[in-house]
Regions:
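Catalytic-loop signature of eukaryotic-like protein kinases
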Residues: 15, 20-27
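C-terminal catalytic region of ATP-dependent kinase domains
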Residues: 26-198, 203-208, 216, 222-230, ...
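Membrane-embedded beta-strand positions of outer-membrane beta-barrel proteins
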Residues: 298, 330-334, 360-364, 415-419, ...
Length: 655
């Protein structure tokens, strides 16, 4: 109760930074329990105001804006999440309301006004009245704030035992609730004295209770039929006996000598568990296995081929027990391409299993930009000096769906395999368009069904964080590591496919940074594609310079300055080199850094009905800007190839 009272004061004054190191604990002779002593309240009354911070708040919820109302509890309590869920687990809702009401009655108007007037007079003139108003508002809403806090940590309850022998009883009640009680265990294996932990978990509030046995020879007994509240028992260093014969449905995770006496639906998992690396500055915090994050994701870019691609979507992640980095994830986006007056939408999903590396997912899309141009087949097709002419436009709507199984082979190496279905519908408005005149195989409505397999190695990191600290993956500005991806597809004779064909495509990129934050980065990439058999035109190996493909196996097209799909053939090969140089720091709304970049590209296609030795080259440069962190990078560049120009703006870089 003393800790809860202190935490309620924390949320009332808006101090979000209440991590474990900001508490002291004292033992008084007249009290059996250690008493909490709050320390270093240095983030109270913070007002992170402004449009930019409001946009950043969903991703960084601790950027609180103090007012007379309580914000979401995640940001307000995030830094103390491990301690809250461990030490407040034994308190039920009535206790929270009672302690909140007690604290509310002690914080009088007089106390608030007196405290505010202790500020320097000059500062009180600026903000004193607003601070008094906000404090009184939060004080008046303290009971509601306490209930929101309670509900936030009640979804998954964690019960930690000690290193001594304990007796745990889990009783599922007829009304759907679950009663958990913990006693000291006597020499006869029976409970002794009064329970030192007792809590009734209510359906609709709690999804799961996790009982951590720690050391000692503990005994857990379950009673009653399983209900909506999942019961997990996590074995410790001692020998535990979990008697589920009178209950059922209990899940025991124990890599030691634990024993499960099973009931209906019981499950024992003895597979070793290796948790992910914890935060470098908070190594005691366990992996997140509760709650859900829902974020807005913008989808913004510009290329001379598509114009502005404007849109966005949501990225939602749910977290579960020993399902890392999340139990499920859904990314749903849609965008409009202004130059082509068409759209693209996609949906990527992942589903993880408990304490297993293998996971499943799918990728689905609907798009009018996948096959936007057609110049014919060959490495030397002409464009009449105008690669942007409507003659070369190829309007096709494509729909695709690929469910996959993902199998980790080694650290950072994953293999995925699954069926693929794709359907295209041509919508050509220009009668004199080249594709209307040639009508290649695949023209019109075309459906295909096949299989896709991908092998991916990804060790990209933000080099400035290594070796001094834990490196993290940064796709916005990779400065170290490498990425290798190889994808194979087979399309058998079925639907509109006249004969079986297939393809293999791959790319490899490496990032070299000889130094720290201000050192330049040399990014190198090589790749290609080979198509086998008689294939529809939109499955050809293309070489172009647009913003590139968008699917999970697609990379940016590799010769900047060219039009999308400028050259098509049976095979394509390319190479890219980018030099990204830091110039200086800046402060526009938020602190950041900026620099310049230069690039050179080269590539060609091969076509069975043509003999060509020509290579297509592109070159250019631009600027990059990074706010707060290099992961938040925006690049703007200009490319030129064969007398044609391209302008590109995007999050991150081309690769």
């Amino acid at each position: 109760r003393a800790l809860l009272k202190a935490r309620l004061l924390d949320i009332m004054i808006g101090d979000f930074d209440r991590h474990r190191d900001q508490w002291r604990w004292a033992k008084f002779p007249e009290k059996e329990l250690w008493q909490p002593i709050p320390d270093d309240r240095d983030q109270a009354f913070c007002r992170y105001e402004g449009l930019v911070l409001a946009l950043a708040r969903p991703r960084v919820p601790i950027l609180q804006n103090y007012s007379d109302h309580y914000p979401g509890m995640e940001g307000l309590t995030w830094n103390g999440r491990d301690q809250d869920r461990q030490l407040l687990a034994g308190l039920e809702r009535p206790v929270w309301k009672e302690v909140a009401q007690e604290l509310k009655s002690q914080i009088t108007d007089e106390a608030i006004e007196k405290a505010a007037h202790r500020m320097p007079p000059e500062y009180f003139k600026i903000d004193g009245a607003r601070l008094i108003h906000d404090l009184k508002g939060r004080r008046d809403r303290l009971v509601a704030g306490a209930e929101a806090f309670y509900e936030y940590i009640a979804d998954k309850v964690k019960v930690y035992l000690t290193d001594g022998p304990e007796y745990v009883e889990v009783k599922r009640l007829d009304n759907g609730d679950t009663l958990v009680q913990v006693w000291r265990q006597g020499e006869d294996g029976k409970p002794t004295g009064e329970p030192f932990f007792r809590r009734t978990l209510h359906k609709g509030e709690t999804q799961e209770v996790q009982i951590y046995l720690e050391g000692g020879n503990d005994r857990v007994v379950t009673l009653g039929k399983p209900n909506s509240i999942t019961v997990r028992v996590i074995g410790g260093r001692g020998h535990a006996v979990v008697d589920d014969t009178k209950g059922g449905g209990t899940r025991l995770s124990d890599t030691g000598s634990g024993e499960l006496l099973p009931g209906p639906g019981s499950h024992l998992d003895r597979q070793p568990y290796t948790p992910p690396l914890p935060p470098k500055n908070a190594s005691w915090i366990p992996p997140r296995d509760w709650g859900r994050d829902i974020l807005f994701v913008p989808w913004l870019s510009y290329g001379s081929d598509l114009g502005a691609l404007i849109g966005g979507g949501i990225d939602t992640q749910a977290f579960g027990f020993r399902k890392e980095p999340y139990s499920s994830r859904h990314i749903i986006r849609a965008a409009w391409a202004t130059a082509e007056s068409t759209f693209r939408a996609d949906y990527k999903a992942e589903f993880r299993f408990e304490n297993r590396g293998v996971y499943v997912g799918w990728y689905a899309f609907a798009s009018g930009v996948e096959a936007s141009h057609f110049f014919g087949f060959g490495n030397e097709t002409g464009d009449g000096g105008n690669q942007n002419s409507d003659v070369f436009k190829s309007r096709q709507l494509q729909y695709g769906f690929t469910p996959s199984v993902f199998i980790p082979i080694a650290k950072d190496l994953t293999f995925s395999l699954g069926p693929t279905i794709k359907y295209g519908s041509s919508q050509h408005k220009q009668d004199l368009a080249l594709i209307n005149l040639q009508r290649p195989y695949g023209y019109g409505d075309f459906g295909e069904v096949g299989g896709t397999g991908t092998l991916e190695l990804d060790t990209r990191v933000e080099a400035s964080k290594a070796p001094g600290g834990m490196a993290f993956r940064s796709l916005g500005y990779p400065r170290g590591g490498a990425e290798v991806r190889v994808t194979g597809q087979v399309w058998p004779k079925a639907w509109d496919v006249l004969e079986t064909f297939g393809s293999v495509e791959g790319r490899a990129a490496a990032y070299l940074t000889p130094g720290g934050d201000k050192a330049p980065t040399l990014a190198l990439r090589a790749g290609g594609k080979k198509v086998f058999g008689n294939y529809p035109y939109f499955e050809a190996a293309y070489l172009g310079g647009g913003l590139g493909g968008f699917g999970p196996s697609a990379g940016d097209e590799p010769v900047r300055g060219l039009q999308r799909h400028r050259y098509a053939g049976d095979a394509a090969i390319y190479g890219n080199a980018d030099l990204r140089i830091y110039i200086s720091q800046f402060h526009i709304f938020l602190p950041g850094s900026w620099g310049i970049l230069g690039f050179g590209d080269v590539g060609r296609v091969y076509y069975s009905l043509e003999t060509s030795t020509k290579w297509h080259a592109g070159y250019g440069g631009g600027l990059w800007f990074a706010w707060l962190d290099r992961a938040n990078t925006l690049s703007v560049s200009y490319g030129r190839s064969e007398g044609h120009n391209g302008i590109y703006a995007r999050a991150g870089f081309a690769f």
